[in-house]
Regions:
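Paired small-residue
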Residues: 87, 91, 102-111, 304-312
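C-terminal membrane-cytosol helix-exit motif in multi-pass small-molecule transporters
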Residues: 175-194, 383-391
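Helix-loop-helix hairpin linking two adjacent transmembrane segments in secondary transporters
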Residues: 142-186
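Cytoplasmic helix-loop-helix junction between adjacent transmembrane helices
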Residues: 107-144
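C-terminal transmembrane helical hairpin of 12-TM major facilitator-type secondary transporters
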Residues: 274-327
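Conserved MFS/SLC helix-loop-helix module at the cytosolic interface between two early adjacent transmembrane helices
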Residues: 63-101
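Helix-breaking motifs and short loop linkers at transmembrane-helix boundaries and internal kinks
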Residues: 44, 76, 97-103, 131, ...
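Extracytoplasmic gate region of multi-pass secondary transporters
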Residues: 32-33, 212-268
Length: 399
């Protein structure tokens, strides 16, 4: 029986569930950053140890993205998503009992593996349910749940951490995904089945690098690596960097909230522009605008400019990144998109491991918040050059 587009109610239910999964992922990813001003002194972590703990979560994301993208193309989207949500919920909950850098790093590594496995699967589901002329908007709408979840984590931190301690945010972030599992089991339809056993499926090397895709794949990995280096540096360290400017923990949580709200708006706006204008102009323009935002953030010392510039940084950074999630898979055949997205995200996660480690090292060397922000400007501009070449040279592979 031929595949047909899912009818509107089924697609809406699937997209809503994917949005909720992305929201819970965003909450979990941001939780460690907004909890850091309390967690680091409570566990007696040095800046270097904190960077290693943050990096462990990113390492889990790398492994999860590679495994999740490969498995999603073979075992089906729904079983993989349920497994991933269960893993990141369970080990986020386990973070509550962490007593030092080793146990904390282990739990963040395993939670990151679950988070990483979910991400390429969400992209594949969004591409399946979206009309061809709304693919980028559908993908960015779904992924706007991640910064929305990050904003909720920042609000949670501002309202509850001082009263209930750093454990409370991981308790909430672990229980909620586990509660979502029975809802997914009942309401989420099975996605596109894996190819029949007799169908010829290309090997990983052929799928990623064959038929003239070598340049696109390398550029995609490079762009994702540098962009996610900056993203996860900010997600993990922005609250602490702002607090170090003399604006306190509340100022740090406010900056994280502004960053995530700007990210949600950027996902919607830049995703819409990509569908209307094509990917080149919106994505190419976003990177220099992001560099200017970080340059301004480095010099800002009062709360209002910090909030505005953090919001602008989120707008351009996440707007460009999540639009690329919707654009890059289209450069590959449909049967290989889960693998392609997973490989690109995994390459990005290698960069994301470096972001927290670099920030911890620079702070330990006395660079201060302004120096860390300024160090990210050339990284952003390099990613922008790679994204420009990729969107100019890339071609739609068809379904």
């Amino acid at each position: 029986m031929g595949a047909s587009p899912p009818h509107a109610p089924r697609g809406a239910v699937t997209l809503s569930l994917c949005f909720l999964i992305a929201l819970l992922e965003g909450f979990d990813i941001q939780a460690i950053g907004v909890a850091a001003p309390l967690l680091i002194p409570a566990l007696g972590l040095t800046p270097g140890q904190a960077g290693v703990v943050f990096g462990a979560g990113m390492a889990g994301l790398v492994c999860g993205a590679l495994a999740g993208g490969w498995l999603a193309d073979r075992m089906g989207r729904k079983p993989l998503l349920m497994m991933a949500v269960g893993v990141f919920g369970l080990f986020t909950l386990a973070t509550v009992v962490a007593g030092g850098p080793v146990s904390l790093g282990l739990y963040r590594l395993l939670a990151g593996a679950g988070l990483g496995a979910a991400m390429p699967t969400l992209v594949a589901v969004a591409l399946e349910i979206a009309p061809p002329d709304r693919r980028t908007r559908t993908t960015t709408l779904m992924f706007s749940g991640m910064p929305a979840g990050g904003a909720l984590a920042a609000l949670f931190a501002a309202g509850f951490l001082a009263r209930f301690g750093w454990h409370s945010i991981f308790l909430a972030g672990g229980v909620l995904p586990l509660l979502l599992l029975p809802v997914m089991a009942r309401l989420m339809p099975d996605s596109r089945a894996p190819a029949a056993g007799g169908a010829q499926r290309p090997g990983a090397v052929e799928a990623l690098f064959g038929q003239g895709r070598l340049l696109i794949t390398v550029l995609a990995w490079f762009t994702f690596g540098l962009t996610l280096l900056v993203l996860y540096l900010l997600l993990n360290w922005l609250p602490s960097l702002v607090a170090a400017k003399g604006l306190g923990g509340v100022g740090g949580a406010g900056a994280a909230f502004a960053f995530n709200v700007g990210s949600v708006i950027g996902c919607w706006v830049i995703g819409m522009l990509v569908d209307r204008l094509g990917p080149r102009l919106p994505i190419i323009a976003a990177y220099p605008a992001l560099a200017l935002s970080l340059f301004g953030l480095a010099g800002a010392d009062s709360l209002l400019p910090v909030l505005v510039l953090a919001g602008l940084a989120g707008f351009f950074l996440l707007g460009a990144q999540y639009s690329l999630y919707g654009v890059i898979p289209l450069y590959y055949p449909a049967r290989s998109r889960g693998l392609a997205v997973g490989a690109s995200i995994a390459a990005g996660r290698l960069g994301s491991i470096g972001g927290p480690l670099i920030a911890g090292h620079l702070l330990g060397q006395g660079w201060g918040p302004a120096g860390v922000a300024m160090a990210m400007v050339p990284v952003v501009l390099s990613a922008g050059v790679a994204a420009a070449v990729m969107t100019i040279r890339g071609h739609h592979a068809g379904d």
